[in-house]
């Protein structure tokens, strides 16, 4: 609230419109893209095991928090583990190197984004492994992991600019 220059009540009201995770009492936001609740997308940073809602979320959090991270997520088509090492500046390692990320553009309001978009944003071992899935989701694009990171780097830079850590 202080950073945004908004009253606390208005900030909480805005956050309640987003698809966040709240504690059992409903008074504390505990997840908004990054969470302690297990998902397919394991996100390790500073030795802490966290999770992201979407494959795409995992790609930009290192930039937002200013720290390197390791992503581990299964290929949705084959179940094979994909591992990605990221820094705020770029992709350091991808295993397998052929891994791609599916991307969809939400046609929904922000409160529905997790349900509507995250299920369609996944990691795949390769474009070939994703071919059957993509045939069922023609609206989705497949991008190599490094290309997705660079795309997010530009977007994050435009949105947050010099407010980013580091």
What are these regions (language model features)?
Residues 16-27:
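A short, conserved structural fragment
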Residues 7, 27-30, 58-60, 110:
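Intrinsically disordered, low-complexity segments enriched in polar/charged residues with Gly/Pro
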Residues 6, 27, 32-34, 48, ...:
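Intrinsically disordered, low-complexity regions
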Residues 30-81:
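Aromatic- and glycine-enriched beta-alpha-beta binding-site module
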Residues 3-18:
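Short amphipathic alpha-helical interaction segments
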Residues 9-11, 25, 72:
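Residue-level detector of family-conserved "landmark" positions at structurally sensitive sites
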Residues 11, 27, 35, 39, ...:
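Residue-identity detector for threonine
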Residues 70, 80-166:
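Long, low-complexity, charge-rich intrinsically disordered regions
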